[in-house]
């Protein structure tokens, strides 16, 4: 129903654009006055006044309608004798009533559920009809108001710009609030985790085995349980594995991607560039699970057989295989961005270098690269963030074992992989095992924030030097 209403409001609003534009022209001719804005702004004015109030009302109604209906139905059920000891019992009864209404309840339907479901259907119908009527009245009222303003030859452009600025502000506010919501959701769950697990045991522990955590209530934890948990949530193997695989990926992606970008920007002919650049960027569109299959079925076994020929013990799920494939996946990001920033370097800098008889390679090395360095650092930063956040390739190619190792031929794991594995399936959100995923997320967020800050400082330093 809501989608249908949004569709109708949108279609009707945009049709009013043409009416508002023609109406302003006809009023100008009839009353012999000059419009205070272009006719199209009167069309925009009518569109905004028709759509925004009704859409805002629909949003507010949609947010509060379920809560109001739920409180009404639970009150009716309680009056009919439903026993609700706590909120969980009330929620269970309400879900049963909804299931009976939707026809998806397969248990015994007693008179209480039947009557409550009929009441639910009744109030659902009342609320739906009321919503349609109120939205219709809001649309009509808004159109009447907007037409009166148009007839008075208002400054429609100023009004439209004020409304659009308000929409831009709301969009920015939504982005900020979303970020704060993510931070606080991680923070609150992490606080619950650290009320059971000592933060120093977490940060400096060298063993990660969350499957050993069975404690739910931090207030009732015993000394034996605490000692068991103390060695279950060590963060060091995860951050070491994440950094190790990301380092291998960067050792592959940075030189190949940067040299590819330099070649495409400075040496490649238009014909080669027209063919090669799309082929390189195809890599960016391949799903990561495909890279994971390639690493697990081809690259991993290849390294294992190659190592056996040299007398080395190589795991079929190794950090080297995961890092290599991850580096190949990241190459297009560095290559494309490096190409763009190198092409953005002013030609006058190159001409000045050539004027003092510098060669092309000397110009690239001494002039172009330093001038493009902030953008290159930005592309590398994007690649590092991509490598740190990658999950599927590591799951399929590097394994799940949290080994603390610097041997690229051994299996290891990353932070994001462990977050996924912890939250797979139906988990209890009051256990340290599940809450550890939020602690990992918060730690990764802080580490990425520090990395971004350092990178921004470096970019700012070099930009001031070469601008």
Description of each model-found segment:
Residues 1-130:
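N-terminal targeting peptides and non-cytosolic leader segments immediately upstream
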Residues 69-132, 151-170, 186-247, 269, ...:
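Periplasmic/extracellular loop-to-transmembrane helix junction in inner-membrane transport proteins
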Residues 151-156, 248-280, 456-461:
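Transmembrane-helix boundary motif in ABC transporter permease subunits
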Residues 247-252, 263, 270, 274, ...:
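Membrane-cytosol interface at the C-terminal ends of specific transmembrane alpha-helices
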Residues 339-343, 347, 354, 381, ...:
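C-terminal transmembrane helix and the adjacent membrane-cytosol boundary/short C-terminal tail
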